[in-house]
Amino acid sequence: MDIVQNSFEAGSIHVAVTIEQGLEKIVCTIEDDGKGMDAHQQRSVLDPFYSEAGKHDRRRVGLGLPFLHQAVEAAGGSFVLESALGEGTTVRFSFKSDHLDTPPTGDLALALATLLAHPLAQDLVIKRQWESDGKRGGYTLDRSELLEVLGEFESSGNLLLLRQFVASQESEVPSEVR
């Protein structure tokens, strides 16, 4: 969630999140059209004691990318950060599904619903794909389409409907993949 929030805070209009999950690995890609980073910033963002000046009033460090990078390395996964100043950023990472140090997925439906309702989110599309025993499936959550149906994400009733809808989509994912 923190990495997607970085996209929102970087002024992104379009953010695409893809989660591909199989029996052997989990691959996640976050692409945005935010302000992007130069080469120095790309190296610096993996330092836990670096945070962009003025980005946060009360926080002086940015731990999301450094912690993610550390977790990926510990679990034998991969991490790629691509960015160009003025063009946006792509973060792609993977975890081996069966590695002891791969963190648990947790309540993915709640996490995805929270991202969709984030006050800085504009055009957010989340694609969730899975493969298990030769079968493939998935779903797409498009914030714009969900807003057309629900109207807004401020009221508790609409937030509950959003959460229930995302949970219903996630319930279709086979348990051995989750």
Where are these regions (language model features)?
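Conserved ATP-binding N-box helix of the HATPase_c
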Residues: M1-T18, A71
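Short beta-strand-loop-beta element adjacent to the nucleotide/active-site pocket used for signaling
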Residues: E20-C28
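Acidic ATP/Mg2+-coordinating residue in the GHKL
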Residues: D32
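Short conserved segment of the HATPase_c
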Residues: M37-F49
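Glycine-rich ATP-lid/hinge loop adjacent to the conserved G-boxes
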Residues: Y50-R60
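Glycine-rich GHKL/ HATPase_c ATP-binding element in histidine kinases
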Residues: E87-T89
